[in-house]
Amino acid sequence: MNRRGFMSAESHYLNALEALDEGDRERAKAESKKATSLDPEHLEAWSVYVEACLPPAPTPPTMIQAAQALAAVKKIVAADPSRMDMWVRGGRLMADDLGML
């Protein structure tokens, strides 16, 4: 927290990581969204958001979950085209879950 009592993007990101580790995907999604609202270029927070949008394996995501994850993947790749992990994740979401290929 900063001097005014507001949490930083990094604090929200760390809370999101903790929530994801605990299996609380909704809280992870909310915390990572707060982090990216404060810092839209926080690519690791966007990565946590991608993971939080998707159910744990082997459960397939719903169309809404896959679309939310893909939207975040696109933001990451736009900011850092070298993120091969996100190119692969996006391709799998499009082909396997959204039936776009």
Predicted ranges, named:
Residues 34-55:
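Short, charge-rich amphipathic alpha-helical segments embedded
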